[in-house]
Regions:
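Structural marker of alpha-solenoid helical repeat scaffolds
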Residues: 64, 97-99, 132-133, 167, ...
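Position-specific recognition of the canonical hydrophobic site in helix A of tetratricopeptide repeat
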Residues: 46, 80, 114, 149, ...
């Protein structure tokens, strides 16, 4: 209660000070303010991004307190926060000549140097500030770390955070930021360890449980991700992000019915969440509830008509429903919004193939391979359409062009074997057939689609027996 009284008293004092200052600005009377009061006025304007008024306050302050290092530092801070970092640095360097033992000056210098991208110089300035500091070192080290976090220098930030942690191992904000930095550096196990230490001291932090869930999600431990999100939701049942990410984890576990329920809960909390609507549609699609999936995909497009993935989801559902003309329209709509997505082009190719438009299908598959040369299915479909058009040599050429990307895909090798066999190039066929068997002997059935009589040839049978010992007995059965 006393702290609350102090807060309101302080706030009331500030309002009185600001009122007097505003009157002075409006030429309604002169007022005198001490340096501390000017600091409070300037900080108030900085917090609300009123830079012009902050500069006015500095000017009045220096008029009343000529040569005040504190106010001159505030002026440099204003220019730094305005984005005029070079000008701010000049001011700080001038002040260094008269305030060489002022730790706050070197803190400000370090922050400005970080803004300018001069990270090594910033470190030197901060280290100077630390050497001149004798109180609250853990807070100073923490503030330095935040400056490096702000410019994405997480390794450097960690050095200062770990020093701060050694000085004050019980301070939760330090633990939190250490965990955050390790997360940003993709050292997920260490990040988890520090968040768990945090929870040992403060088990009711919904944000830390949520962050922990995200880390397990990144590690693809989706069950643990669900559990962490559940803890966050138990603490705060209105925590929309935790509900949404719980649904994502459930979907990744293949628990689509549960995911559908959780996405609906997420939408109740965030009715305009375009991703929740789209992912709900995707979960229903996985459950083969295509009509309902389309409804949710449509709702996603109503929230954001430019969200290509939702239009694509509608196309996929219509493809599964064999409504190929509808699928064609929505695949085209998705591509019109995002021409660089290989999945969209692949689906367009499939739709054209089902409609018998083989030339258009081949163009779409070719575009897919251009955008993603590792898409083996697109290469295989492109080659097979050439084969169906009587161009077996071209089919071989396509898969050979793809081979540097797809050499480790068994089906690619089996297709090459079958196409070579069709052209009576048995030695080449044997070579690719054996490569395919080495990669996955069970995938040999791919050749039946093209050259089933291959498997009656003695040399191919011998290879099957070599790499697939149970093949002979399976054949008899």
């Amino acid at each position: 209660m006393d702290k609350e009284k102090d807060y309101f008293q302080e706030d009331g004092d500030l309002q009185e000070i600001l009122g007097r200052f505003e009157n002075m600005l409006n030429q309604l009377g002169a007022s005198f303010f001490d340096v501390y009061e000017f600091e409070r006025i300037i900080d108030h304007y900085l917090d609300s991004n009123h830079f012009t008024k902050a500069i006015d306050a500095v000017k009045f302050g220096i008029d009343q307190h000529p040569g005040s290092a504190t106010l001159l530092m505030k002026e440099a801070q204003i220019y730094a926060e305005k984005g005029e970092s070079s000008k701010a640095l000049e001011m700080v360097r001038s002040l260094e000549k008269i305030e060489e033992s002022n730790n706050e000056l070197y803190m400000l210098k370090g922050m400005i140097l970080n803004q300018l991208g001069r990270v090594n110089e910033a470190e030197s300035a901060f280290d100077k500030a630390v050497s001149l500091s004798f109180e609250n070192l853990d807070d100073i080290l923490y503030d330095i770390a935040l400056s490096f976090e702000f410019v994405n220098q997480y390794k450097i930030a960690l050095r200062y955070l770990e020093k701060a942690h050694r000085r004050n191992p019980k301070k939760l904000n330090i633990l939190y930021d250490i965990a955050y930095c390790y997360d940003r550096l993709h050292d997920f196990d260490r990040s988890i360890g520090y968040y768990e230490r945090y929870l040992d001291r403060e088990p009711y932090s919904e944000n830390v449980w949520y962050n922990l869930g995200l880390l397990y999600y990144k590690k693809e431990n989706f069950q643990k991700a669900v559990e962490c999100c559940d803890f966050a939701i138990a603490i705060n049942d209105q925590y929309a992000s935790a509900v949404f990410n719980k649904a994502n984890a459930q979907a990744n576990l293949g628990e689509y019915e549960e995911a559908v329920k959780t996405y609906k809960e997420s939408i109740q909390l965030e009715p305009e969440n375009v991703l929740a609507h789209c992912y709900l549609g995707e979960s229903l699609e996985k459950l083969e509830a295509y009509s309902e999936a389309i409804e949710w995909y449509r709702k996603s497009t109503e929230i954001d008509p430019s969200y290509a993935e939702a239009w694509y989801g509608i196309a996929v559902c219509y493809l599964f429903m064999k409504s190929y003309q509808d699928a064609l329209y929505y695949a085209g709509k998705a591509i019109s919004l995002d021409e660089e997505n290989p999945d969209f082009w692949f689906t367009l190719g499939n739709v054209h193939a089902h409609l018998g438009a083989h030339t258009d299908a081949m163009k779409a598959y070719a575009k897919t391979t251009e955008l993603d040369p590792y898409d083996d299915e697109a290469w295989l479909n492109l080659a097979h359409l050439s084969y169906l058009q009587g161009e077996t040599a071209k089919a071989i050429s396509i898969l050979k062009d793809a081979y540097s990307y797809t050499f480790d895909i068994p089906e690619v090798n089996f297709y090459l074997a079958a196409y070579h066999y069709k052209l009576h190039k048995t030695d080449q066929a044997l070579k690719f057939f054996e490569k395919g068997l080495k990669l996955d002997h069970t995938a040999y059935i791919a050749v039946r689609k093209i050259s089933p009589d291959m498997l009656d040839e003695p040399r191919f049978k011998d290879l099957l027996k070599k790499y697939f010992p149970s093949w002979t007995s399976r054949k008899r059965n």
